């Protein structure tokens, strides 16, 4: 027997074929959401209030300071928030201090700043009763980027861009004449020396002294028309504010506010970190020769002589001195924006090769490591980035790859919320300033100054309508988990589908261990929406990190120390793969090892290896790592497999896969669909609706009983996608449980493991051509035994409003409706729970007042005799739609009188939940986990299905032609291993990239007493004869997908029509008709089917009068009358007339035909028939 037994949770043991030991447990898979939101509550909010505080009025007399904030208790718990359609939120209160400097008076007050949405424990938000997820956004990191470009003559040039978090961009570029230009905030370009002069380096000599002599600078100075600071300032002002009269003072303040005002320009922590890293002097000194002596200014010690080659070892010795004080000098400005001040920079001279002179000296300038808390761009940054640009022109330094994950970062929930909150606060700040100047400073209070509307509005807007705030995909727990770990490059400040090219979408070597190379949607979003890899974490700057095992450089042994590396840190190391063979002491078995260095796979000696992968599955995401034998599948099909698992419908009786990967337990636990214990303890009570756990606490080494935790279970709740969300306990009374153990299974879970489908007996064979083109043949057993039966819950809503003619009423007393239609309604007119409903049945009886009409003399007489007051009401009851039959699961009633919060104008709201049990059906879509999908074409009786020698009929027949061209061989290996596992009565785990080998599969088949090739003789169920060849038969895990035929089947006789063209609407949602398009018309024309064609273009479509009369004729059994003129023709003529054309319609004998509108007689016809020919609003 190969493999070892591993316990997954309390209830499941699997035989694992993994050869690599797990050295690191998987992190909590929804940490990306919860940790980010926690940061926002603890630090993000405080940062925001510090940024905005203090707010001063224009005179400086009044000062408003934000001191502290606190979050109260939410009004309703999570479940109740969903039920009441409200937001799960807590009140945010801020302590504010108002200081009047004239009188010295200080007022403190606590101000309510609105209800702030809270994150649930499972990483979601409840907004207006709907569960939503905030997707993390992948954006370019603020930094300075250098790239190479070729001009139209093929000449090499460079561009540089300084990108802030918010503020003006600064771009450098060269032209064909080797002049360096700068663009400020996408305006017209000016020579870069103009910007330097404006900063305060007025003369040519000052600029040359600052940057060092070189020909590019000389060319730029010659092109520069300005020769002083003032002229340079005016030149820039004219470019930035064309048309305004330029003055030196205005120009100074404009540049000052554009770049050096922290409120207008923000690099954020990450921008400062990246700029300091990029412009650090050590990056450009590596492998260069010094052109000057490096001396320690404090001790006078010579650290390196002129001409020293700075290799890795020499540079490592120099770095501590370079970071302290070596090479620092002060550049003095003589005016300009910086007035007369000192700019601290660091400069070292080196030799570079030159075509003409052999070699020359250039200056390498860094920004002198500007302090981390300077969030705007510093003058030293501008000088150093220009110096780097000149160095690149001389071949020193590196360009950047913008698709590298070192240059792309994540904005998670916390940061997205912070940015939105900042917008609201800045709007509020403006209002506060205005109110300060208007109101009397002696009687004013902080409460009167602050208007919280803009803050509340910006938060509501973000949660309600931002592209990144999405309705949670709750089809099954895996869909839920993946949605929370999704990374989107779209959204505000990101890319758009149309602009994104191939490079951005492509897999990059830096994705390794950070972003899954498999899981991404097919279609226009491919590569723009990704998923976090299973072990990846996000660091404080928003860069993705992946864990590696450290290799001890002294001994060359792999240690148990784990380091999390970002993509650009990893570029400096050689990393071995997780499957490199190790001795017991951690040393490598082989002398030469396959390793990665900067995206290249190379063979290196083992003493050069710095790190080793933690696990083979760190490359892929949670959903992808649920596919066994992933290593045997083509990546395109694996992509479909990963995506289709998310569309699996939760079944009535879920079953965990016989052939799993070991990830089923982890993903089920972290998805949020299971009930997980918060503390260790003992189970005291278990019912279908709740589980009680008594905590066990250790005090002085002794165990004592603590508090009682009560966990509520969800029973048959409707998920966001209309599937059934049901939890079942899997622990018993008296069980001792650990912290974070699964207490109850959620939907699509069995015994604490993800269970999206069922293990069924599959044969790869054809059957009378019914599985042509990936179609699937099913056995009737799967229908009879409810193997693929799923439960679907639909919600219907009806409200009683106040109308101009009086209030609507929910009642059992409905006009023109027989007692039979009311049999299931209670005395209030609402359907009873448990009633069976067919489409068209009344769910909620409701009447709406009609306009009062003038009565005729006869009617008045009758009313006078019988005393009956005319009840002028319309029947507006809620009825079950087509395909909406089922059983009433629950009814919820909300009344304004009972204190329920309802929208304005609504007095009563009734919600009816109808549950459907859907068996598997022809036309449903099914799939395996390897991208092998198909539609059910035929359900055969059990007796017709081919059977095994022992008489067992197979459950499913798949087409063998679906395998070779698709190259997803994993399904065949799964089939054989599944059969062996069924025979042995075990569950197996075959982890991705470290699973069962072919030998393991054949060995397990032999162990189970089967043929080594896994093939069997099959007998035809119809004749009892054996088939000619032996067939691959085994157990495959097949799932039923959310594309069900019941949702797609649709038929219409009459229904709503479009208002303008009077043609039937389209689509099932509108109860529309089938489009008979241009090409279909050609088909009928080709056959000369004139009457059919006339019928389709008139009475079946938009001949308003004709269709009413045709309906009448059919009802009375008379001949169908002659069709009239289609409405769309009348619309066309009206359009032509509106263009000023005189269009008339002539008959064949040149007589003009009058275009009549509907006359009274025709009106009465439609009234008599009482047909609903208008747009039916309830169906829209």
Swiss-Prot record:
Bias-annotated ranges (Polar residues): 1167-1180
Catalytic reaction list: RNA(n) + a ribonucleoside 5'-triphosphate = RNA(n+1) + diphosphate
Keyword list, A-Z: DNA-directed RNA polymerase, Nucleotidyltransferase, Transcription, Transferase
GO biological process, one term: DNA-templated transcription
InterPro entries the record matches: DNA-dir_RNA_pol_bsu_ext_1_sf, DNA-dir_RNA_pol_bsu_external_1, DNA-dir_RNA_pol_su2, DNA-dir_RNAP_su2_dom, DNA-dir_RNAP_su2_hyb_sf, RNA_pol_bsu_bac, RNA_pol_bsu_CS, RNA_pol_bsu_protrusion
Ranges of Acidic residues composition bias in the record: 1154-1164
Entry EC no(s): 2.7.7.6
Segments for region (Disordered): 1154-1180
CC annotations in GO: DNA-directed RNA polymerase complex
Top-rank taxon, per record: Bacteria
Molecular-function annotations in GO: DNA binding; DNA-directed RNA polymerase activity; ribonucleoside binding
PANTHER family from the UniProt entry: DNA-DIRECTED RNA POLYMERASE I SUBUNIT 2
Family, as annotated: Belongs to the RNA polymerase beta chain family.
Function summary: DNA-dependent RNA polymerase catalyzes the transcription of DNA into RNA using the four ribonucleoside triphosphates as substrates.
Quaternary structure note: The RNAP catalytic core consists of 2 alpha, 1 beta, 1 beta' and 1 omega subunit. When a sigma factor is associated with the core the holoenzyme is formed, which can initiate transcription.
Annotated protein name in UniProt: DNA-directed RNA polymerase subunit beta
